[in-house]
Amino acid sequence: MNGIVLGSVYALVALGYTLVYGVLSLINFANSEVFMLAAFGSFFAVDLLGLNVADDPIQTGSALIGTMALCLLISVIIGAASAVLVERVAYRPLRKRNSPRLVFLISAIGASFAIAEAVGVWGPKKREEYALTQYVKKNEVFSLFSARVDQTDIIIVVGAFIMAAILVNFVNRSRVGRGIRAVAQDAETAKLMGVNVDQIILITFLVGGIMAGGAAFLYMLNTPFARYDVGFLIGVKAFTAAVLGGIGNIKGALLGGLLLGLIENYGAALFGSNQNIGTMFSFVALVVVLMFRPSGILGQSMSRSRA
């Protein structure tokens, strides 16, 4: 079950990469730090409010629902706000100057390192590990093919599925979603047809930030500790998932995330639960897929597909 749980988190973060790439044909490498800020922001807010239940996790009832709802809301708000700030600072000024694509890449990587190092230097614990809030005790609910499935696993997988379903429905059925697809297909034509391209790009970053914030909340449920650089490895794997599934394709990001989680989990299991071996297997799988299908498994741009 761990593979599906990990894959669900990767898939949500991968959606942020694939949305921005679908609209701008650029990679938002600062998306990993949006994830990190959402995770820590939620943790600190809940801790300051006196709701940190790490020593005595809540199992049921309104206290659990209320704490989780508050933490999810804070994660999503911080994720969305951080992503919008990245767009305003690291992307929009460069777009106004018609800067080369390489400059966007450097700007995004610079923003990513700046955010991570700022938290590492000025955060309450600097570069030490933070004990993250644990909301639900890991009581086994049932076993599936000899795999232990607990309450947290179910919440993460179901939560990721709901968020992904909402996003697909939003992109396919809403007016803003149609605007996103129009800009992804041809920004100049969309602008001539009255679409506010700058606003659509901003909304795309915002939606990607919401996905990263939701992923950060779910990640916190299953992870007891995190550091200032927690977003780096998650971001690299989520980007790998997006490329594996076909970057620019929403369904591809979801498929890539789940596949990557399963490959990583089973790869680690083959060598005595060594997580580093699992990570190696996931990148080997990416190379193999790209050798035979350079565009990824579902390598179709978002503009040509109804996600």
Question: Which positions does each model-derived feature cover?
Answer:
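Membrane-interfacial amphipathic/re-entrant helices at transmembrane-helix boundaries
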Residues: 1-13, 41, 52-71, 97-102, ...
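Helix-loop-helix "hairpin" substructures at the membrane interface of multi-pass membrane proteins
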Residues: 6, 145-226, 250-256
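Alpha-helical transmembrane segments within multi-pass membrane transporters and channels
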Residues: 55-111, 255-260, 264
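Membrane-embedded helix boundary and interhelical linker motif in transport proteins
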Residues: 1, 24-26, 30-85, 269-270
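Extracellular/periplasmic helix-loop junction at the C-terminal end of a transmembrane helix
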Residues: 111-144, 268-276, 298-304
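Pore- or pathway-lining transmembrane helices of multi-pass membrane proteins that form conduits
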Residues: 33-37, 94-120, 230-243, 259, ...
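Cytosolic-side transmembrane-helix boundaries in multi-pass membrane proteins
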Residues: 107, 127, 185-192, 196-199, ...
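Transmembrane alpha-helical segments in multi-pass inner-membrane proteins
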Residues: 10, 68-76, 205-212, 218, ...
